[in-house]
Structures are given as C-alpha cells and as structure tokens.
Amino acid sequence: MGIFMPLQLNFATSRAASHRVLGALFLSGLVLCGTLAHAARVCDVTAYGAKGDGAAKDTRAIQDAIDACAAKGGGTVRLAAGTFLTGPLVLKSHITLEVDAGATLLGSQDRADYPEVQELRERALQPLLSATHAEHIVIRGGGAIDGNGKPWWDAVYAHRGAPNFTAALRPRLLLLDRCKHVLIENVTIQNSASWQVVPYYSDDVVIRNGKILAPARSPNTDGIDPFSSSHVRISHMLIDTGDDNIAIKSGQPNSPGPDSPSTDITITDCTFLHGHGMSMGSEIAGGVQRVRAARIHFKDTASGVRIKSNRDRGGDIGNFDFRDLTMEDVGTPILITEYYPRIPPHDTAQPVTRLTPHFHDIHIRNLKATGAKEAGIIVGLPESPITTVTLDHVEIAAQKGITVSDATVTAHDFSVTAAAGDPYTMLENAKIDRK
C-alpha cells in the first residue's frame, strides 16, 4: 500500500553510487515481480477437496489451500459459487481470501469445532477467521462470510444472568491479532456469534465498500471494533447490527495494564442502520486519540455519536473531529458519558486512578438529526469533568432535550427543538458557552 515516487538520478554521482542505485532498482524489481507472482497464484479450495454443498465440513480443505499458498510465498485462496461450511480457519501473510459473488463461507454451528483460546486477554472461542502476526492480507470477492451465530444468540437470551454461564463464550467472526497491511473490501460479513471484525493491536487496516449485517436483536454483534489499533480506515460501509456499529476500544475492565491506545482512525461515507451507533468505548484503558469521521448517515440507530466509559475502564480520550452527519429516527444523536452503562441520579467525586476516564477535545460539526427520542447526553464524572466539547452548526429535533452535567461545551449555531420539556437541562458543574 505504498506510493511509488519517481527516482531522480544525479548523473554527476560517482560510479559506486550509481551501482548502489542500480542495485536498489534491481532489488525493487525482484520484490515487485515476487508480489505479482503471489497475486497470480490461485489455490482453488475445490482442488483441495472442498465440496461447497453447505453440508460437508470443508474446514480441512480450505485450511490446506491457505497453507499451500502460504508455503509458496502467498497467493489467492478462491471460493467460487457454493456454500462452504467450515470451522475456524487461520489466515497467513500474503494471502488473499477471495469469496466470489454467489459463494458463502458459512461458520459451523457445532460448538466442538471451536476450541477455547485466550483472546483479548480473556477466555474465548477460536474465531471463525483469524490471523496472528501476519501482514499483507486481503479479503474480498463479492460473496459473503456468515458466522451462522443464531444458536449462540439464543443461548445468551435463554441463560443471561445465570452464574458460570459457559455459553457466554462465543466465537468472533474475524480477529486480526497484531497484523499489518490488511485490506477488506467488497464482501458481506454477517451473523457473527459475537463481535464481527476485530483488528487487535494491528496497524494499517482498510475496510471499505462492503456490508456488515446482523439482526437488530442479536447480542454483542458489533460491526467493527478496532482494539488498540492504529491507522484504521473505514469507508463506504453499510453496517446494520445488534450492537455498536463501530466501537473503538483499548484495554479491558479493571485492566492491570499496560494498555496501548487506538489512534489515527478515519470513518467516512458510511451508512449505519440498526445498532448502537459510532462508539468509542466502553473499554478504553489505553486511550483513544485522533478519530476523524465525515459524511455518515444514521437511520434507526440507538445512538449517533457515542463515547462511553466508566471508572473501571477509562483512559485519555480525545482529539475527535466528527462532521457532516445526518440522522433519522436515532434514539440519542449525541451520547457522551463517563457513567456507562447507567447514569446514577446522584454521585460524589471519587479518587482519580489510572482507569479514571478523561474526555476532552471532542468536536462535532454540521450535524442534523430529526425524529430523535432524546437530543443528547453529555455527562462527566465529578472528579473528571468532560472538557472542550464543541458543537458547531448542530440542529436536533427530538422528543426530549439535551442534558449536560460535569461538562463544558462551546456551541456555535446550536439548536435543539424538544417536543416536551426544556430543550436544555443543565445540572451540576455544567456549562454551555454560546458563541
């Protein structure tokens, strides 16, 4: 994913320097030729025994195709038309997984196919697709990757709250563990048992021109969760899920540390339908910095911009620029809270710790929302008020107004129309400075 720049030669250089330049060009040519060779190598999974009939498990055949391509330096593992039933698969460096239009990679519903592993510092089941310490991975093709997660969702609803509930362990659909240079494009990812796409401690991840889907009531089916990752670019995605459409994370509740931040993330030209919105948190002990979002349309999401944490999982959160957002029938267009998941009616300041959230420098420009239930919530902790929130050209029509507590907001051309009650409710240590 580099940019080739023209090489300017100084013909007055010494012969030795010229030889070094020519040598570099020769090596670059070898690298380019090797890359083209990798791209040209195709391992069709049917040649390794895959049936694609939706009944026989094709796990071994598909993994054999991945391993064979990787052993030769990389290539394309191709799934043509058909339904390829599989357990967990492990991707390798320099592999393109191409799921053609008309093909579905379908996750097995057999719990025994998913070994228990340590993942994100906790117990989990092996993801349907994963890669560890890998680079230059591509997933594309116009087809679908389906986690087939309904049995896990049903188990969660049947046993939620029960002690020692082992069915709470569910496989994620795609985990990129300490990977770099990843491209996911033109593919539908759907119906994961749990979080769908998780870049974990990864760098340079591009996700574009696709769909991520799950039923509105499917539990914890987050669309994309960058976790302690950097340089993640998400664009032209339709995300319709049962939980956060996107949730940027870093760290775990009560994390002992150390934790790394998520940084330099851009989200552009996307549509978010059912789900909990464009979220930061709640697990952000490592912090989240430099997030940019533009030209996002929200329809029927529970929240729009959602920044959430609490005293047992917070960190330094800020330098966000969100602009050109449109929202229809969104529950709460702006939800910024250091009291996730519930805001108490009364509270007093607590000692500041390593996990106390600190929200700052959150800038929202050109937002228009209609049909909202509650215009907004901006509520900080008394020991860590939210600072430097700017609302510029923001217009919200809602049933209820906006509530601000332990937060300082600067507003320019900010309008809230509430069908009932006061459009602005200012509680303890709250300030809206209108410019």
Per-region residue spans from a language model:
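Bacterial N-terminal signal peptides
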Residues: 22-34
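N-terminal secretory signal peptides that target proteins for export/translocation
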Residues: 1-18
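Extracellular/periplasmic carbohydrate-active domains that bind, remodel
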Residues: 36-435
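Intrinsically disordered, low-complexity Ser/Thr- and Pro-rich stretches
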Residues: 5-9, 23, 412
